């Protein structure tokens, strides 16, 4: 039966003014033995119109003073019975008809319509995801204390954005989404049929228990440019040896350095695998140097010989016997015939080819064949540098800075990547890349490179029944539309890659999840293409303006609440939901969670016994069913025997939802609701009356 709380007295478009009955003007109302929340800004009311219930959201409230008008010369603020009338404004958001909620403008409030509290059935209809829709719980409604579930298909087959200031709880939300997915009945098959790649800039998700996935199905790669003991990640050679990628990676200048990289990589990619052929190509430079002493750069020959010795890893070779001959020629001492062989300017290369091949060909071809790809490309670029600068085709001064950058960059790359010519099928289903110890250049390059590679592979697998999910924490680090100010010279290419992915990826089963504390820094094109959002507290005007411009599913009233959200609270909105939902995300001390907790100094500055008691409490095998008092009693009894002060410190700092614990305990009890309630508040169990009532009221 409806509980009437007011009547519509004015309508302006979709906004109705409702005069409230006197008995509902408190924060909480006792009605038929139930404690109900009073209507307030942000809550919902139901406007009755025939067999249709118009659901409206309260957006403001005011009072009408019957005793004092605006024109009163003297304001009498003494209370007078029935002189104050409360009026609220509510905006229609949809209707409930036949038990189904629908966003529509077909029905609007009318003056005289009665207003009631929103019923449990109305809440159920509003948050219903459809009949037999697979869903996951992520938390509770902030205002109505209802369970909030998300539709698995409409969320995970979409691009997701998780935004919020530092300390707002966004890391827990990102982790909770995938933790609950992997814990669900669909988790095992999700890990079998899909790839989940996590780009972790701060090492928050790289620990053993992250996402609740065991090491058999999870791989963590901790990349470090500071150490030679870094883990390595697999990169397909067609992506890493792409001229455009290497030009950006080496910060090559467009006028002179990019053409050099392009020509070198073109030659390399054409001859790759034919190392005998490539050895002949490199030796061709040496032969030309030997007969052009008068026209080639003076130190080019010695530079070539020293590079060759480093490449084949030897300190001496027959080429060391090359010296200056008469008339701008070179000569070499033949150790087998004990005489000099001369290289004259007018000689044909063919005259000397066989001799030089006998001296160095086999060693050079073997080095090309056996070197790892990073070392091989490094030396090939250096041989190409000598070839390009020896006769002045390219000014040496133009390429020298590039060669220094190439050395540094490839040295860093060699620490962290393993170049392969196969694909990622053999990697674990959950692949986490920890970049906290990588330098800035690698942090910008690896996510883009991995995303490009994954996206290319997923496009090739279209229709195979598998999907790829790329999860990027602190996404503003690589999707920053203004990062050119930071010396990031290949921002545009990286943004193009991700903009293509977010525009076209859904067609091929490739989905992005982006988390950031600075959404305003991310390219507006990318933010506007996100389908579903989890918005935590944001206070920066630039961030709020970005959200306002790019989220069409967020109404003004919901938007205005964002700066006031508490820790763990967020508004969930997007294409998967019929209306924005204010949610407090589940948080459980005993669940795996990201390593993103704020450092509490006073926890460091307490007695060792206090710390030990807290750790003991967290490790209790039945922590999810314990009451606060029950945990205190356990800590102070045998065999623990902590002091009462240490036990109190532990239970005060556990960050446990004791109401949720009461519900878990109640589910394991048998008997009538009254018997379960009595058991929960008993001295043995120790839940409070409020916690016990909460639990019993939610039992099926």
Q: Can you name each region flagged by the protein language model?
A:
Residues 1-129:
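Conserved ASCE P-loop ATPase motor domains encompassing nucleic-acid-directed helicases/translocases
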Residues 135-225, 572, 604-605:
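Glycine-rich phosphate-binding loop of nucleotide-binding enzymes
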Residues 181-185, 453-459, 492-512:
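Substrate-engagement module of ASCE P-loop NTPases
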Residues 201, 510, 517-518, 529:
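Conserved H-loop
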Residues 203-209, 237-497:
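P-loop NTPase motor domains
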Residues 215-223, 525-537:
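A short helix-turn-beta junction within AAA+ P-loop NTPase domains corresponding to the substrate/partner-engaging
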Residues 567-608:
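Conserved P-loop NTPase motor module
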Residues 609-700:
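An alpha-helical, amphipathic repeat domain used for nucleic-acid recognition
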């Amino acid at each position: 039966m409806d509980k009437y709380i007011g009547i519509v007295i004015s309508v302006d478009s979709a906004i109705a003014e409702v005069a409230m009955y006197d008995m509902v003007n408190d924060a909480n109302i006792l009605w038929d033995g139930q404690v109900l929340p009073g209507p307030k800004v942000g809550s919902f009311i139901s406007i009755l119109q025939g067999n249709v219930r118009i659901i409206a959201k309260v957006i403001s409230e005011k009072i009408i003073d019957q005793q004092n008008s605006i024109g009163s010369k003297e304001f009498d603020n003494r209370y007078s019975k029935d002189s104050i009338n409360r009026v609220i404004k509510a905006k229609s958001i949809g209707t409930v008809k036949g038990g189904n909620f629908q966003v529509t403008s077909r029905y609007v409030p009318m003056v005289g319509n009665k207003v009631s509290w929103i019923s449990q059935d109305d809440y159920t209809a509003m948050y219903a995801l459809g009949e037999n829709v697979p869903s996951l719980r992520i938390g509770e409604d902030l205002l109505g204390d209802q369970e909030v579930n998300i539709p698995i298909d409409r969320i995970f087959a979409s691009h997701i954005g998780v935004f919020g200031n530092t300390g707002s709880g966004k890391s827990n939300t990102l982790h909770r989404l995938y933790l609950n997915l992997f814990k669900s009945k669909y988790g095992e098959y999700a890990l079998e049929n899909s790839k989940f790649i996590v780009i972790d800039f701060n090492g928050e998700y790289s620990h053993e228990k992250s996402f609740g996935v065991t090491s058999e199905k999870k791989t963590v790669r901790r990349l470090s440019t500071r150490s030679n003991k870094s883990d390595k990640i697999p990169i397909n050679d067609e992506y890493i040896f792409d001229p455009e990628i290497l030009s950006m990676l080496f910060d090559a200048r467009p006028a002179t350095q990019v053409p050099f990289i392009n020509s070198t990589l073109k030659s390399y990619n054409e001859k790759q695998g034919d190392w005998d052929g490539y050895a002949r190509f490199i030796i061709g430079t040496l032969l030309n140097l030997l007969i052009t002493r008068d026209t080639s750069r003076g130190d080019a020959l010695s530079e070539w010989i020293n590079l060759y010795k480093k490449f084949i890893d030897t300190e001496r070779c027959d080429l060391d016997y090359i010296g200056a001959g008469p008339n701008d020629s070179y000569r070499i001492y033949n150790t087998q015939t004990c005489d000099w062989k001369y290289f004259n300017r007018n000689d044909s290369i063919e005259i000397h080819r066989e001799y030089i091949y006998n001296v160095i060909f086999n060693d050079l071809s073997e080095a090309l064949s056996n070197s790892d790809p990073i070392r091989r490309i490094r030396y090939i670029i250096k041989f190409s540098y000598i070839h390009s600068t020896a006769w002045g085709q390219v000014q040496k001064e133009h390429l020298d800075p590039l060669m220094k950058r190439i050395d540094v960059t490839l040295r860093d790359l060699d620490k962290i990547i393993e170049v392969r010519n196969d694909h990622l099928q053999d990697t674990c289903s959950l692949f986490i890349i920890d970049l906290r110890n990588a330098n800035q250049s690698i942090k910008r390059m690896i996510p883009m490179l991995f995303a490009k590679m994954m996206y290319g592979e997923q496009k090739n697998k279209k229709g195979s029944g598998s999907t790829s999910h790329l999860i990027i924490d602190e996404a503003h680090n690589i999707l920053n539309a203004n990062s050119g100010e930071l010396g990031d010279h290949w921002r545009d290419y990286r943004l193009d890659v991700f903009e293509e992915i977010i525009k076209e990826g859904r067609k091929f089963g490739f989905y992005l999840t982006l988390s950031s504390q600075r959404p305003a820094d991310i390219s507006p094109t990318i933010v506007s293409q996100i389908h579903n959002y989890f918005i935590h507290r944001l206070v920066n005007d630039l961030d709020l303006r970005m959200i306002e411009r790019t989220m069409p599913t967020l109404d003004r009233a919901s938007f205005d609440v964002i700066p006031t959200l508490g820790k763990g609270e967020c508004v969930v909105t997007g294409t998967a939901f019929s209306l924005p939902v204010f949610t407090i995300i589940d948080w459980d001390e005993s669940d795996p969670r990201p390593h993103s907790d704020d450092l509490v100094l006073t926890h460091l500055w307490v007695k060792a016994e206090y710390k030990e008691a807290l750790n003991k409490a967290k490790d209790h095998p039945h922590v999810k069913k314990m009451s606060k008092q029950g945990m205190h009693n356990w800590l102070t009894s045998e065999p623990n025997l902590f002091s009462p002060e240490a036990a109190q410190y532990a239970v005060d700092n556990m960050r446990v939802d004791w109401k949720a614990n009461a519900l878990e305990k109640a589910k394991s009890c048998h008997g009538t609701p009254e018997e379960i309630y009595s058991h929960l508040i008993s001295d043995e169990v120790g839940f409070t009356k409020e916690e016990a009532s909460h639990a019993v009221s939610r039992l099926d």
